[in-house]
Amino acid sequence: MTAKTPLHTTHLACGAKMVDFHGWDMPLHYGSQLNEHHAVRNDAGMFDVSHMTIVDILGAGGRQFLRKLLTNDVDQITHNGKALYSCMCNEHGGIIDDLIVYQRASDNYRVVLNSATRQNDVAWIRAKSEGFAVGLQERRELSMLAVQGPNAIAKTLSILAPAHVDAVSTLTSFECVDVDHWFFARTGYTGEDGLEIIVPNEFVTQLWNDLLHAGVTPCGLGARDTLRLEAGMLLYGQDMDETTTPLESGLAWTVKWEPEDRGFIGMGALVSQKQQGIKRKMVGLTLLDKGIMRHGQKVIIEGCPDGIITSGSYSPTLQQSIALARVPMETGEQVLVDIRGKLIPAKVGKPRFIKQGKPV
């Protein structure tokens, strides 16, 4: 039986087409995935992301623990209310998950993880926390909305209480704030500005309806996927997993090597991979002829082993097919993609296609 978020009946009332997403009954779209995509790029859209896993790490040992657990270094967080994106790796350097960690206080960190990896992630974090002065709380009583787009913050501010408005108005990118049991973060998964809002379950329906009345468009998983693909944001389980490392996933920037004595989990394996030479990289592909690139298709590179499409789709913004692919380091400026037995040329570029609504 699939799990349901507190907004399930609200989604049905809004005309959502529901699908099973890793055991959750979630909206795919509300009639037009294309319109929802454009709403986020040009105005404001909202997503129910209450299926995500929220874990609070409490106690004086929180920072010390996270410096061991994550590839990125929370010592870069210089004050409360800051956020950091990171990978969480196993001892072999394989990516267990990617996540955002928020410092709410010196002894209070919030981690938001992917839903598909909930059970494994929580078990891993709990096991690795032994010996540290921390306690873990999985916050299933909370719901989460992502409000994204160039007008997302303005429309959200128009429906918030004055105390919330004052706090949210001062947030900059990758900052967060708690106000009256509501949590606001200026983060997202679309390549647009916006907020991710975490509230007690009993408040989320009213928040959704207020945003709807303010002109924010309900959006489903379909638009979320094309938006994040255009922005070059990876999807765990598809673009990377425990068989891949940050260094071959375009995520080397999330690995902080200094100080060497930090010794985060997987550091030894990643240092070894770096020294021996990274053999694969993540690139962006733009198809040069008709067709749609999809996950799992082969990428043919002259003189090299085949690469693989990890994510591919039609880009509503660029009006052509785009993809993320893992290919040999020697890959040049053009490749061939095997689409149903036909070899279609594609241009190789950086794994990001759109920034703030504009082509990169």
Swiss-Prot record:
It is an enzyme of class 2 (transferase). It comes from Legionella pneumophila subsp. pneumophila (strain Philadelphia 1 / ATCC 33152 / DSM 7513). This is Aminomethyltransferase. Keywords: Aminotransferase, Transferase. Pfam families: GCV_T (PF01571), GCV_T_C (PF08669). NCBIfam families: gcvT, PRK00389.1. The glycine cleavage system is composed of four proteins: P, T, L and H. PANTHER family: AMINOMETHYLTRANSFERASE, AMINOMETHYLTRANSFERASE, MITOCHONDRIAL. InterPro entries: GCS_T (IPR006223), GCS_T_bac (IPR022903), GCST_C (IPR013977), GCV_T_N (IPR006222), GcvT/YgfZ/DmdA (IPR028896), GcvT/YgfZ_C (IPR029043), TrmE/GcvT_dom1 (IPR027266). Belongs to the GcvT family. HAMAP family: GcvT.
